[in-house]
Amino acid sequence: MGEIGAPARLLRHAELVSEAAENLLALLERERVALDAAWVRAGAALHDVGKIEHVGELSHPGALHEPAGERLLLAHGVAPHVARCCRSHAQWATLECALEELVVALADKLWKGARVPALEQRVIEAAAGRCARGVWDLFVPLDNGFEAIADAGPARIARSHVA
């Protein structure tokens, strides 16, 4: 993202969301849930790329960066399913999403310590479908893992400030 003008604050955010995504990938791997790790990694790194065009959304709420990011990535030849993470990370509640997209959306919450039960439930349900296990079989280990990732949120927030 640095090559296309991403400010340091956006790069740091992508780094911290990617850190949470790596923790989620490790958790899902421990539970033998099959997913496309490369998709999750790319989505976590690029989900807010549209904030290059909508810089005000780095410090204020807004959704203009979502479609802008998807368009920007598609224009640079990024695979459509990865580019879609620009929208699905924020619109997961209204879109049909693959597990990978839901993991990106969850990483974007957990990095700062935020728990979103409805999103976590969708991740658990999608993960159960991928590994042919019951939702309740996965609930406790995944919920405990989500809690551990969120618990590190304050430390990540402390590292989010750039000079």
Where are these regions (language model features)?
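Divalent metal-dependent catalytic cores for phosphoryl transfer on phosphate-bearing substrates
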Residues: 2-4, 33-129
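A positional/architectural concept
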Residues: 5, 9-29
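Residue-level recognition of alpha-helical structural elements
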Residues: 6, 10, 35, 99, ...
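Charged/polar positions within long, soluble alpha-helices
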Residues: 26, 112-115, 151
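Charged phosphate-binding loop/patch that engages nucleotide di/tri-phosphates or the phosphate backbone
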Residues: 135-163
